[in-house]
UniProtKB/Swiss-Prot annotation:
GO cellular component, one term: chloroplast
Chain positions found as N6,N6,N6-trimethyllysine: K14
Keyword Transferase on entry: no
Natural source organism: Ceratophyllum demersum
Cofactor note as given: Binds 1 Mg(2+) ion per subunit.
Quaternary structure annotation from Swiss-Prot or TrEMBL: Heterohexadecamer of 8 large chains and 8 small chains; disulfide-linked. The disulfide link is formed within the large subunit homodimers.
Gene designation per UniProt: rbcL
Top-level class of the enzyme under EC nomenclature: lyase
Biological role stated in the UniProt entry: RuBisCO catalyzes two reactions: the carboxylation of D-ribulose 1,5-bisphosphate, the primary event in carbon dioxide fixation, as well as the oxidative fragmentation of the pentose substrate in the photorespiration process. Both reactions occur simultaneously and in competition at the same active site.
Lineage, opening ranks: Eukaryota, Viridiplantae, Streptophyta, Embryophyta, Tracheophyta
UniProt record similarity statement: Belongs to the RuBisCO large chain family. Type I subfamily.
Name of this chain's protein: Ribulose bisphosphate carboxylase large chain
Active site residues according to the UniProt entry: K175 (proton acceptor), H294 (proton acceptor)
Residues carrying N-acetylproline: P3
Length: 475
């Protein structure tokens, strides 16, 4: 036997496979203020103990692999490994558990949502020992929060830029989402803005198609904004979607928007990717642009209650990556959103400090310190009859976005915008007078419609429209 072979043998390295729980299940571990904490909903395969399943998640999302390797001896696994420190059964579910995992902060690159997700969810979701796995929540430590810029501007700066206070902001997605020429698209924008909306919006899949190239759309929308501002005396905006096939093209579009002098651009942050989104957010802060975020593709990731990533995690990630608005569901419209859970992640978007509250799906106390907040956007199947509920549920710091609920008005876009603005102002006035919008909302709308024919027509059109289906999500 050669001396080199003898040296390897004397190290004491023992090859083979051993249970993850021997190394990565540590119920006595006391979490540190600097740890990133994760709550996973774990559904083990039959015969796999929950401790082994939780430990496998901790291992495969940090330092572990399927077998012992000799290079483990070249570093301090105890310093760098993830730890499953607690497991609790899910009430009412068979063989399903919440596994809590702590990750040392040194595992993550500063200021990179991309790296954080690559580590925590990048590989473990295909693990054979698990039937299903869902990331329910993350606790981001202050030490890591401070490595991110976050939203380009935040709620208060946006209000100051727009000179709009004391009420939710009103928006509208231009429909049909695809097929309009740039000039007709700009005309629709102008009609909505002059009628009383604060914003109009590109739909998420409006990029630069043959029927409407991005530069033409940007120019005609800018013309519409300036014309509506001159007529109304209010600051207006249109979410110009800068999402593109490459980061370079995305930045070219954002730069052109800045040159036009418009106040806001837009990005599809999940399909575009976190690296692109963070790059755009930094540019927007440096150049005075607001950034509207659409969550296209989120339901592919978050809708199944046993597998994937809950939207509250995607919302936290967006606040870190950067965005001034993000779509958050409506509770009352056509897209899914259970009230308490939706308001849980709305608070995670807006507030500085959010206490743990399992009844709202918040597994960890989250301190955002000085990071600006994000305005939640309620959009999808809403109309004037929903205005009291939306005002009561979301409060002033929100954007209420009516696409079909504006453009579907029987008299046209501008009257549709008037109807929404009148309904909103009536609801805010009633709330400020101490009226209960949850009980008196319909009466508030009826009273306002007596002096607004535009609102009366909208009330008649949508009086029978409801979207009532059971929610998929559970706490």
């Amino acid at each position: 036997m050669s001396p080199q072979t003898e040296t390897k043998a004397n190290v004491g390295f023992k090859a083979g496979v051993k249970d993850y729980k021997l190394t990565y299940y540590t119920p006595d571990y006391e979490t540190k203020d600097t740890d990133i904490l994760a709550a996973f909903r774990v559904s083990p395969q039959p015969g796999v103990p929950p401790e082994e399943a939780g430990a496998a998640v901790a291992a495969e999302s940090s330092t572990g692999t399927w077998t012992t390797v000799w290079t483990d001896g070249l570093t301090s696994l105890d310093r760098y490994k993830g730890r499953c420190y607690d497991i609790e059964p899910v009430a009412g579910e068979e063989n399903q558990y919440i596994a809590y995992v702590a990750y040392p902060l040194d595992l993550f690159e500063e200021g990179s949502v991309t790296n954080m997700f690559t580590s925590i969810v990048g590989n473990v979701f295909g693990f054979k020992a698990l039937r299903a796995l869902r990331l329910e929540d993350l606790r981001i430590p202050v030490a890591y929060v401070k490595t991110f810029q976050g939203p380009p501007h935040g709620i208060q700066v946006e209000r100051d830029k727009l000179n709009k206070y004391g009420r939710p902001l009103l928006g509208c997605t231009i429909k049909p989402k695809l097929g309009l020429s740039a000039k007709n698209y700009g005309r629709a924008v102008y009609e909505c803005l002059r009628g009383g909306l604060d914003f109009t919006k590109d739909d998420e899949n409006v990029n630069s198609q043959p029927f409407m190239r991005w530069r033409d759309r940007f120019v005609f929308c800018a013309e519409a904004i300036y014309k509506a501002q001159a007529e109304t005396g209010e600051i207006k905006g249109h979410y110009l979607n800068a999402t593109a096939g490459t980061c370079e093209e995305m930045m070219k579009r954002a730069e052109f928007a800045r040159e036009l002098g418009v106040p806001i651009v837009m990005h599809d942050y999940l399909t575009g990717g976190f690296t692109a989104n963070t790059t755009l957010a930094h540019y927007c802060r440096d150049n005075g642009l607001l950034l509207h975020i659409h969550r296209a593709m989120h339901a592919v990731i978050d809708r199944q209650k046993n597998h994937g990533i809950h939207f509250r995690v995607l919302a936290k990630a967006l606040r870190m990556s950067g965005g001034d608005h993000i779509h958050s569901g409506t509770v009352v419209g056509k897209l899914e959103g259970e009230r308490d859970i939706t308001l849980g992640f709305v608070d995670l978007l807006r507030d500085d400090f959010i206490e743990k509250d399992r009844s709202r799906g918040i597994y960890f106390t989250q301190d955002w310190v000085s990071m600006p907040g994000v305005l939640p956007v309620a959009s999808g199947g809403i109309h004037v009859w929903h205005m009291p509920a939306l005002t009561e549920i979301f409060g002033d710091d929100s954007v209420l976005q009516f696409g079909g609920g504006t453009l579907g008005h029987p008299w046209g876009n501008a009257p549709g915008a008037v109807a929404n603005r009148v309904a909103l102002e009536a609801c805010v006035k009633a709330r400020n007078e101490g009226r209960d919008l949850a009980r008196e909302g319909n009466e508030v709308i009826r009273e306002a419609s007596k002096w607004s024919p535009e609102l009366a027509a909208a009330c008649e059109v949508w009086k029978e429209i409801k979207f009532e289906f059971p929610a998929m999500d559970t706490v």
